[in-house]
Amino acid sequence: MSETLATPPAALHTWLSRWRQFSALTKPRVVQLIVFCAAIGMLLAVPGWPSLPAWGVALAASIGIWLVASAAAAFNCLVEQTIDSKMKRTAWRPTAKGELSNTQTLSFAVLLCAAGMAVLWVWVNALTMWLTFATFVGYAVIYTVLLKPATPQNIVIGGASGAMPPVLGWAAMRGELGAEPWILCLIIFLWTPPHFWALALYRAEDYARAGLPMLPVTHGNDFTRLQILLYTFVLFAATLLPFVYGMSGWFYLVAACALGVGFCGHAFRLWRHYSEALARRTFRFSIWHLSLLFAALLLDHYLGPLLRGTP
């Protein structure tokens, strides 16, 4: 009797453990930022407050993009399991620890990708589906398989796929693309190198041990810090484009300038005097920078007309 009673809790524990392993493959925090950026693109694509049907499309698009992004993350874990096992930052991943087989991981990734593509095809539109699939290929194949192990410019070139979420969101709501989503894409594209290189600075030993040609490993600490500073300056200029192009108003411009000065300040201090603590702070600030920048753009989209006294 005692063994019978003990079975359900044990089975539940096993099921929960397996669920956590598959969930970890999807890199939830990264995917959350992807969906957030896509959602910003969706909301900016609609003048005023979205209608109820538009909210339905936005929900379906968010689910579809989330599924495909999760599939790309799982495929990345599959390909990089040997590399991940050599790095402290990633050694905990289920594939690196051998907790999930290659077949399980690949099947999971294919299932997620197929489900996401189906959602986008049925409830959103074909343009969004194909753009999302192209983004999947860009990250899972071009970046993960070809670029990351081959060149220190992997982050720069591969960053194009990571910059696509606002374009996907815009396409979902409009069914077409203009200049606006590509401006948002450019901002993320320029944000990606200083963001990841700040991380790579204090994880350089990890990357060297794994044999990955990240910029601090191939070109050294000083060169990487200079590149972070230069990219941050260019990024600052790019963040002003929504105002210049007429996508936003003064509220966004003030926020973009404040955040840009903050990011440049972190990059400048890191360039002048390196420390691991400074690199960590710069990395963390970069996340806040992008999140708050897009949040300010969204607030300006809705509050701007009220502040200007226009409907």
Curated annotation (Swiss-Prot):
Which Pfam family, any one of them, does this sequence belong to?
A: UbiA
Keywords assigned by UniProt?
Cell inner membrane, Cell membrane, Heme biosynthesis, Membrane, Transferase, Transmembrane, Transmembrane helix
Transmembrane as a keyword? yes
Question: Quick check: keyword Ligase in the entry?
Answer: no
Q: In which pathway does it act?
A: Porphyrin-containing compound metabolism; heme O biosynthesis; heme O from protoheme: step 1/1
Q: What class of enzyme is it?
A: transferase
Q: Where in the cell is it found?
A: Cell inner membrane
Per its record, the protein catalyses: heme b + (2E,6E)-farnesyl diphosphate + H2O = Fe(II)-heme o + diphosphate
Q: How does it sit in the membrane?
A: Multi-pass membrane protein
According to its UniProt entry, what is the function of this protein? Converts heme B (protoheme IX) to heme O by substitution of the vinyl group on carbon 2 of heme B porphyrin ring with a hydroxyethyl farnesyl side group.
Cross-referenced NCBIfam families, in alphabetical order? cyoE_ctaB (TIGR01473), PRK04375.1-2 (NF003349)
| Family, per entry | Belongs to the UbiA prenyltransferase family. Protoheme IX farnesyltransferase subfamily.
- HAMAP family associated with the record: CyoE_CtaB (MF_00154)
The miscellaneous annotation reads: Carbon 2 of the heme B porphyrin ring is defined according to the Fischer nomenclature.
- This one is known as Protoheme IX farnesyltransferase
